[in-house]
Amino acid sequence: MAVLLVLTGNAIAGSLLDLCLSRAYARQHFTWKYTVSPNNADNPDTLRRVAPAAERNRGPILDVLSRVLPKAGVVLEIASGTGQHAVHFAAALPTVTWQPSDPDAASRASIDAWRKHASLANLNAPIALDVRSAPWPVPDSLAAIVCINMIHIAPWEAAEALFQGAGERLTNDGVLFLYGPYKRDGAHTAPSNEAFDHQLRVTNPAWGVRNMEDVVQLGRAANLWMEEPVPMPANNFCLIFRRTGI
């Protein structure tokens, strides 16, 4: 069976502590600020976190995923964050089995609360998984990898590890799908992205909006060739790579 590996949110930023701190800071100060479902403390729904950015971007992202991803297989989602993407994508793609994951226990609790709330037959309970801990505890043959809003809020080494893992795990013609803001030819595509990049680098000099051309070079080194950059709302892009040369 084909397997789809999906990374959303933040991959590992050096260590689990770095990851938790970077995710918490980004959600507090940038677009990932989330709220908790307003229920009483005894209700497991209180664990369901809501990130406004995930609510806004899930529809446009799904439109592209529906077009480029294989139609069947197991979807392993890494760094699932709140779990909103997992629920939305699993509901819209019922022919795949969605396997969310996150290295952060609180995030896994939110994902599981969303899973129980949605009660989808094709959405599994979240697992603990650190993307920078090799070898990845996933099957060797992956049909696709999807990474949403990660490489700009993590050190460059996280992007390198992502492409290395993708090159090792994707089957021939497998897809690597990235979503987020990018510079083109070293220039920001909008003033808001430039301001966001400045905020990121003040917070952590290892973070920042990446040059699309540098990301493309990582792909080439892993036999992953970009087919198309898809412009998205709010000055983001989807980058679609395909595995060749197996």
Kindly give the residue locations of the regions a language model identified.
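Class I SAM-dependent methyltransferase Rossmann-like catalytic core
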Residues: 37-70
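Conserved beta-strand signature within the Rossmann-like core of class I S-adenosyl-L-methionine
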Residues: 173-182
